[in-house]
């Protein structure tokens, strides 16, 4: 199963997988507007892969078959301040018990 992977010109760490190079006919128009001009990153054969770096291989294959595309979004950003505040609150609570 060959697919083409494109990087978004507008959204950092956002990638679009499509079945055929330069064929975006199955991608919704609104998504293409938000995605911006696609920049080809690579062509890969998913049949020879055991896993992908940032996406679930089986989910990618399923979406390509059912929808004709797969959108890979960036991982959620860590909120280190929120985590620190939660840890401080937990420490304070333990100290009061």
From Swiss-Prot:
PROSITE patterns (alphabetical): YCGL
Signal sequence segment: none
Domain YcgL stretches: 1-85
UniProt-listed Pfam families: YcgL
Domain of life per record: Bacteria
Coiled-coil regions, chain positions: none
Name of protein: YcgL domain-containing protein CPS_3517
Organism of this sequence: Colwellia psychrerythraea (strain 34H / ATCC BAA-681)
């Amino acid at each position: 199963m060959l697919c083409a992977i494109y990087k978004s010109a507008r959204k950092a760490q956002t990638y679009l997988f499509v079945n055929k190079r330069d064929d975006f006919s199955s991608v919704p128009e609104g998504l293409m507007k938000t995605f911006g001009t696609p920049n080809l990153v690579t062509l890969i054969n998913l049949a020879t892969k055991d896993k992908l770096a940032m996406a679930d291989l089986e989910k990618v294959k399923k979406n390509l078959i059912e929808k004709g595309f797969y959108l890979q979004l960036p991982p959620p950003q860590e909120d280190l301040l929120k985590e620190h505040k939660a840890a401080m609150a937990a420490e304070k609570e333990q100290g009061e018990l």
